[in-house]
């Protein structure tokens, strides 16, 4: 049956999204007004993160994984760790022997 694996992937993505939304239930309506307000604010922030994750999961299944490797790096053999300013002598690091310490 053609397309069966794609359907399974989509169903699995939907199950993941369902679990994400179930993991962030609405806050309870008890407590002081300020406590309820803070709980709702935190819940909305978490809900926005869940929405973003759900969109990424669905986009990955529908459109395939995104290629976020925008920066082309040179081969690792050409990379080195050194101080580019360490090769030059700086006037700031010289000590004047005539200066007095107070």
Curated annotation (Swiss-Prot):
InterPro entries: REV_protein. Keywords: AIDS, Host cytoplasm, Host nucleus, Host-virus interaction, Methylation, mRNA transport, Phosphoprotein, RNA-binding, Transport. A motif (Nuclear export signal and binding to XPO1) lies at residues 71-82. A motif (Nuclear localization signal and RNA-binding (RRE)) lies at residues 32-48. Disulfide bonds: none annotated. Pfam families: REV. Asymmetrically arginine dimethylated at one site by host PRMT6. Methylation impairs the RNA-binding activity and export of viral RNA from the nucleus to the cytoplasm. One of its GO terms (molecular function) is DNA-binding transcription factor activity. Belongs to the HIV-1 REV protein family. The RNA-binding motif binds to the RRE, a 240 bp stem-and-loop structure present in incompletely spliced viral pre-mRNAs. This region also contains the NLS which mediates nuclear localization via KPNB1 binding and, when the N-terminal sequence is present, nucleolar targeting. These overlapping functions prevent Rev bound to RRE from undesirable return to the nucleus. When Rev binds the RRE, the NLS becomes masked while the NES remains accessible. The leucine-rich NES mediates binding to human XPO1. This is Protein Rev. It comes from Human immunodeficiency virus type 1 group O (isolate ANT70). The gene is rev.
């Amino acid at each position: 049956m053609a397309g069966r694996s794609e359907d399974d992937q989509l169903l699995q993505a939907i199950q993941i999204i369902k679990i994400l939304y179930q993991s962030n239930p609405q806050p309870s309506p008890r407590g002081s007004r300020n406590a309820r307000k803070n709980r709702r604010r935190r819940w909305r922030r978490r809900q926005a993160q869940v929405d973003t994750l759900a969109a990424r999961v669905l986009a990955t299944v529908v459109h395939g994984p995104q290629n976020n490797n925008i920066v082309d790096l040179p081969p690792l053999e050409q990379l080195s760790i050194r101080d580019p300013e360490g090769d030059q002598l700086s006037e700031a690091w010289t000590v004047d022997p005539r200066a007095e310490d107070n």
